[in-house]
């Protein structure tokens, strides 16, 4: 659903583009600054707030050109561009955080890695930096996202990556061989229930012995606030019919929203138990990996650090859960970040 009502890209000399935004949630100007044809900075100036600077996609690794930016904005929208800019720095930080603590793979290993649902490449770029000697397959069902990703990749990384457009997520015929690591970042929640039950076993079968399946940034089904689509409290505890009625009135959707589309957008999130149940249909023994690394940071702090808009409801939830952690030691996070190891064949 397109949210941008108007968009103008006005070159100012050869160095700056300004994208004018009129959006029901975001407004103001998005400014891209270039030097010698390469993106150097991006800023969002809201109509009613202070200017905010963003770390642009593939910062520090891949040069982003004026053509890249135009493709990103015109293939999708200006609000999508803002989302991409907001997420990029967080995805790299979250990848380091989760992989350091849960995955347990040497960073210098010569692995074969699948980033399934790679989209425009945030998680793939983070993995490229984390595993400098690995080879990658980036797979997605959306061809236009892969086009954006191809436009970013520098020559040094193109030799390490094969990009594959998936035609049927239930069969995955385009994927050959086995993988040492399969990564799904912000993917599982967008699969319909039947797709989850068919896809995860297919991916698990393609995992090498002692390989890792990593699922990150998936909303937790039972968190007090539905953070992914509606930002409404308690909707996770409502029956489907009532949850759909609330979603239609949330301001993010309209009266034509169907339950199937709401599920596709990720309204119900997932649980670790559901993921394990889906994997259990495939061969191999499942072992959920846990961290033995003491650290003052945890998944609750990881969520709060990555939130771009700290609403009053989210702030209250964070404060309450912080007190729960202090009193009981229990860490409750709105996001599922989990890693499984395939320890042996059945």
Task: Please provide the spans of the model-predicted regions.
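Class I SAM-dependent methyltransferase Rossmann-like catalytic core
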Residues: 70-96
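Conserved alpha-helix/loop element of class I SAM-dependent methyltransferases that forms part
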Residues: 90-109, 126
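Conserved glycine-rich SAM-binding loop
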Residues: 119
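Class I SAM-dependent methyltransferase SAM/SAH-binding core
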Residues: 122-170
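A conserved beta-strand element that flanks and buttresses the S-adenosyl-L-methionine
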Residues: 183
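A short glycine-rich, Lys/Arg-flanked "PGG" loop and its adjoining helix->strand segment in the class I
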Residues: 197-209
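Conserved class I S-adenosyl-L-methionine
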Residues: 214-241
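A C-terminal cap/extension of S-adenosyl-L-methionine-dependent methyltransferases
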Residues: 261-346
């Amino acid at each position: 659903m397109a949210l941008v009502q108007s968009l103008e890209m006005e070159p100012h000399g050869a160095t700056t583009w300004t994208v004018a935004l009129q959006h029901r949630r975001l407004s103001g100007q998005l400014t891209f600054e270039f030097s010698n044809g390469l993106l150097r900075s991006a800023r969002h100036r809201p109509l009613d707030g202070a200017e905010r600077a963003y770390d642009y996609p593939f910062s520090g690794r891949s040069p982003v050109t004026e053509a890249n930016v135009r493709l990103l904005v015109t293939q999708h929208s200006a609000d999508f561009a803002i989302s991409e800019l907001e997420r990029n720095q967080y995805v790299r930080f979250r990848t380091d955080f989760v992989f350091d603590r849960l995955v347990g793979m040497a960073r210098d290993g010569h692995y074969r890695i699948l980033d399934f649902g790679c989209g425009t490449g945030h998680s793939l770029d983070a993995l490229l930096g984390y595993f400098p000697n690995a080879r990658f397959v980036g797979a997605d069902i959306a061809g236009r996202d892969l086009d954006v990703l191809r436009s970013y990749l520098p020559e040094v990384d193109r030799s390490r990556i094969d990009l594959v457009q998936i035609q049927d997520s239930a069969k995955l015929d385009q994927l050959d061989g086995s993988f040492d690591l399969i990564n799904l970042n912000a993917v599982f929640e967008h699969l319909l229930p039947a797709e989850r039950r068919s896809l995860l076993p297919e991916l698990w079968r393609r995992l090498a012995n002692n390989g890792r399946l990593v699922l990150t940034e998936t909303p937790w089904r039972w968190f007090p606030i539905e953070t992914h689509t509606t930002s409404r409290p308690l909707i996770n505890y409502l029956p489907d019919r009532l949850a759909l009625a609330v979603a239609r009135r949330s301001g993010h959707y309209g009266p034509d929203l169907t339950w199937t589309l709401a599920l596709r957008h990720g309204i119900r999130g997932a649980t670790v138990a559901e993921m394990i149940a889906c994997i259990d249909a495939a061969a191999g023994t499942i072992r959920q990996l846990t961290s033995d690394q003491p650290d003052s940071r945890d998944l609750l702090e990881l969520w709060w650090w990555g939130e771009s808009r700290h609403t009053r409801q989210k702030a209250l939830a964070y404060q309450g859960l912080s007190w729960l952690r202090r009193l009981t030691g229990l860490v409750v996070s709105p996001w599922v970040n989990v890693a499984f190891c395939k320890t042996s064949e059945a």
